[in-house]
Amino acid sequence: MPDLHTDINIHETINSGQIFLWENYGNEWFVIDGHDIIMAKQKPFEITTFSKKPKNFFREDDNYGKILKNITKDKIVKKASKYYPGLRVTRQDPFQCCISFIVSANSNIPNIRMRLQKLCIKFGTKVRFQKREFFLF
C-alpha cells in the first residue's frame, strides 16, 4: 500500500498548472471538479467530496512506484521527479479540463484561475461544503 503522505504531494499537484479552480485554507485544499468539490488534506491524508462519492482525483489507485521506475529512464524526467516528488497527473472532469485548456491560451495561471472562477460564478451552481461557499463548474 502506498504511503499517501509522501506519494501524493497535494500542494505541488494543485499548483502544477493542471487545476485552476481551487482554494486553500491552511491544511485544507478545496478543488472544484465538474459538479463536485474535493476537500483534500495532506497530513493526515484525507479526501472528502461534496457528492459523498469516492474519487481518485489524485490517482491514488495508480502504482506510483512502477510509474516512476518507468518514466525516470528519461534523464530530464528523472531530474524533474526529484524536484517534485509526489506530483501527480490528476483525473479531473473531462469537460472542465477541456474548457480550462481553451481558456488557458496565451495566458498565465492567475488569469486562467480568474477567468474560470468568473465562469463558475456566472453559470455554475452555488453550494455550501465544509461551511464554505463554492460555485460548481
Tell what function each PLM region has.
Residues 1-137:
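HhH-family (HhH-GPD) DNA N-glycosylase catalytic core used in base-excision repair
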